[in-house]
């Protein structure tokens, strides 16, 4: 795997609440320099990032109902529509974790379908926050996401007590098969960690340490 191939698996991420426009500018400049697949940012910063990234191949990914996922379906749909108008090209939505634990299958499938519809063909990733789930619940969530028509199952927000693990990525991939991609995120800071996730089945890596990961290739 060369630097470009690795960079194309990375969503270069900055989702902390205490950031400035200068931080977003740095993020976008790094994405252009290193060739990251996307920048993943909060919706407020989409217009600024769109201007910085015009005439590049770097996509703009944003988060929906982040980081808790406990809003209503209509609220999530509204966020997607507004973010789409601003220029978002991919959407990372947090699943309703309480509804998942309560086995509200029909509700969750309907919600995912509504969000996918609102995204108008753009990529939708559903974050399940694996650190709060049993293995049975992780499998259940992945099956629901497949049925709902989303494009990725994503491990974590990065705001929970634990992020992605190799074991979780391997489990999610075993259920996702070829119908659903897997995004690993949360706590991935080194090239070695990223490679472990990719080898376990991750199609995309969400990280705020993209530059360090790329620079670690070949060391």
Curated annotation (Swiss-Prot):
The active site is at residues 92, 154, 183. Keywords: Cytoplasm, Lyase, Schiff base. Belongs to the DeoC/FbaB aldolase family. DeoC type 1 subfamily. One of its GO terms (biological process) is deoxyribonucleotide catabolic process. Gene3D superfamilies: Aldolase class I. Pfam families: DeoC. The keyword DNA repair does not apply. It is found in: Cytoplasm. Pathway: Carbohydrate degradation; 2-deoxy-D-ribose 1-phosphate degradation; D-glyceraldehyde 3-phosphate and acetaldehyde from 2-deoxy-alpha-D-ribose 1-phosphate: step 2/2. Its EC number is 4.1.2.4. Catalyzes a reversible aldol reaction between acetaldehyde and D-glyceraldehyde 3-phosphate to generate 2-deoxy-D-ribose 5-phosphate. It catalyses: 2-deoxy-D-ribose 5-phosphate = D-glyceraldehyde 3-phosphate + acetaldehyde. This is Deoxyribose-phosphate aldolase. It comes from Dictyoglomus turgidum (strain DSM 6724 / Z-1310). GO terms for molecular function: deoxyribose-phosphate aldolase activity. NCBIfam families: deoC (TIGR00126). One of its GO terms (cellular component) is cytoplasm. Its main location: cytoplasm.
């Amino acid at each position: 795997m060369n630097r470009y191939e690795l960079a194309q698996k990375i969503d270069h991420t900055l989702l902390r609440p205490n950031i400035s426009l200068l931080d977003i500018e740095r993020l976008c400049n790094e994405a252009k320099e290193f060739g990251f697949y996307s920048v993943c940012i909060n919706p407020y910063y989409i217009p600024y990032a769109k201007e910085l990234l015009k005439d590049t191949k770097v996509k703009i990914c944003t988060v929906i109902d982040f980081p808790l996922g406990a809003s209503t379906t209509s609220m999530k749909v509204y966020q997607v529509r507004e973010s789409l108008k601003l220029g978002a090209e991919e959407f990372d939505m947090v699943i309703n974790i309480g509804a998942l634990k309560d086995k509200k299958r029909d509700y969750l499938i309907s919600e995912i379908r509504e969000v996918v519809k609102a995204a108008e063909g753009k990529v939708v990733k559903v974050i399940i926050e694996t650190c709060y789930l049993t293995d049975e619940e992780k499998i259940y969530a992945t099956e629901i996401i497949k049925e709902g028509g989303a494009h990725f199952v994503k491990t974590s927000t990065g705001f929970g007590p634990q992020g992605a693990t190799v074991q979780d990525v391997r489990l999610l991939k075993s259920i996702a098969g070829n119908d659903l991609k897997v995004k690993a995120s949360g706590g991935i800071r080194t090239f070695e960690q990223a490679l472990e996730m990719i080898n376990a089945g991750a199609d995309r890596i969400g990280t705020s340490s993209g530059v360090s990961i790329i620079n670690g290739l070949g060391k």
